[in-house]
C-alpha cells in the first residue's frame, strides 16, 4: 500500500499538474479538476460523483501508478481524456471512443434531450444522422424516440467500426441501420422526417491554430476546405431530396456560421439559442430549402 497517497491528494496532484500544462478543455470536460476526477475515477473504477467518504481512501501502489500514468499522458501528450479511457459521455449515455472518431461534444445533444422541441413539433418517425462518427447522435435519438427508425452514415469505414460497436453496446441494432456513404450517395431513395448532422466544418486557418488536443482527432472529421463549408454546401443542396414533406434539417457549423450566412444570405437560417452559451446550429425545413433552392444552381 502507498503510505500517504490518498484519493484527495492524487486529485490535487492532477489538478495542479493540469493547471501548469496549458491544456485545452474542449472535449466534454471543463477544467483541470474535472479532468483529474475523470481520469482518477476511471483508473480506480469509482463513480464520477466521488462521494466525500472516498477522498481519504488510500489506493494501492499499482493504482496510484496508473493514475499518475494517465495524468502524465494527458499533460505531456495533450491527449484528450476520452481517448485515454476509451469512454465519453453524451446525452447522459456512455460511448466507446478511440482516435478513429471525434470525441462526442456536440450541443446537438441538448436538442435531443428536449426531443427537438419546439423546433420539430411532431415526433419524427425516421431520422438520419449524417456524418455520424461514433454514432452518438443517432444512438441518443434512438433513446429519445424509441418508435423511430434511425439511419446513421459516415464516409469513414474506421468511424463506422466504432459506431457499430456503440450500436451493439446500446442494443440498438434492431432500430438503427448503418451505411458507409459519402453524404447521401449510398442511401438510395429513402426519405426522412429529420436529418441531423455534425459534419466537418473547420476552415483551414482555424485548423492550423487549434489547440494540440484537436490534432489527436481524425482530420477527416474536422476540416472542410478554406471556409469550412465544403461539406455543408453539399448537404444544403442535396437534403431536400431526402426529406419528407414537413421534414427538417438540423446542422452544426460552429464557428463557420458567419461564413455560411455570408455565402447564403437569402436562406432563412434559424439559429438555435442555447442558454449554456453554445452556438452554431441551424434549422431549415424542407419547404424553406425548396423555396430557396436556386442557390444550388
Show where each model-derived region lies:
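Alpha-helix termini
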Residues: 21-25, 115-122, 171, 243
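Short, conserved glycine- and acidic-residue-centered signature motifs
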Residues: 32, 101, 228
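N-terminal auxiliary segments of SAM/dcSAM-dependent transferases
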Residues: 2-91
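Active-site/binding-pocket entry motifs
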Residues: 45-46, 101-102, 201
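S-adenosylmethionine
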Residues: 111-114, 147-149, 153-297
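SAM-dependent Rossmann-like transferase core, predominantly class I methyltransferases
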Residues: 54-147, 157-162
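A general structural signal for well-ordered alpha-helical segments in protein cores
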Residues: 11, 36, 67-68, 134, ...
Amino acid at each position: 500500500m502507498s503510505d500517504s497517497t490518498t484519493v484527495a491528494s492524487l486529485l490535487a496532484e492532477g489538478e495542479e499538474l493540469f493547471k501548469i500544462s496549458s491544456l485545452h478543455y474542449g472535449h466534454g470536460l471543463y477544467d483541470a479538476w474535472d479532468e483529474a476526477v475523470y481520469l482518477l475515477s476511471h483508473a480506480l473504477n469509482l463513480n464520477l460523483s466521488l462521494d466525500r467518504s472516498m477522498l481519504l481512501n488510500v489506493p494501492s501502489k499499482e493504482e496510484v501508478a496508473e493514475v499518475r500514468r494517465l495524468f502524465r499522458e494527458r499533460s505531456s501528450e495533450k491527449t484528450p481524456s476520452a481517448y485515454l479511457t476509451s469512454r465519453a459521455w453524451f446525452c447522459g449515455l456512455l460511448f466507446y471512443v478511440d482516435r478513429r472518431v471525434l470525441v462526442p461534444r456536440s450541443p446537438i445533444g441538448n436538442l435531443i434531450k428536449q426531443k427537438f422541441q419546439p423546433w420539430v413539433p411532431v415526433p419524427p418517425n425516421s431520422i438520419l444522422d449524417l456524418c455520424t462518427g461514433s454514432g452518438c447522435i443517432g444512438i441518443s435519438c434512438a433513446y429519445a424516440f424509441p418508435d423511430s427508425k434511425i439511419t446513421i452514415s459516415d464516409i469513414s469505414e474506421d468511424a463506422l467500426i466504432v459506431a457499430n460497436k456503440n450500436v451493439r453496446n446500446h442494443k440498438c441494432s434492431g432500430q438503427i441501420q448503418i451505411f458507409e456513404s459519402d453524404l447521401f450517395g449510398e442511401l438510395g431513395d429513402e426519405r426522412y422526417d429529420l436529418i441531423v448532422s455534425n459534419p466537418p466544418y473547420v476552415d483551414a486557418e482555424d485548423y492550423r491554430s487549434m489547440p494540440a488536443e484537436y490534432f489527436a482527432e481524425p482530420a477527416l472529421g474536422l476540416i472542410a476546405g478554406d471556409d469550412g463549408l465544403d461539406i455543408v454546401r453539399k448537404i444544403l443542396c442535396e437534403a431536400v431530396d431526402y426529406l419528407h414533406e414537413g421534414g427538417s434539417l438540423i446542422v452544426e457549423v460552429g464557428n463557420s456560421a458567419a461564413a455560411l450566412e455570408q455565402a447564403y444570405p437569402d436562406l432563412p437560417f434559424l439559429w438555435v439559442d442555447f442558454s449554456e452559451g453554445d452556438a452554431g446550429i441551424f434549422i431549415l425545413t424542407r419547404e424553406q430549402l425548396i423555396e430557396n433552392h436556386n442557390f444550388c444552381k
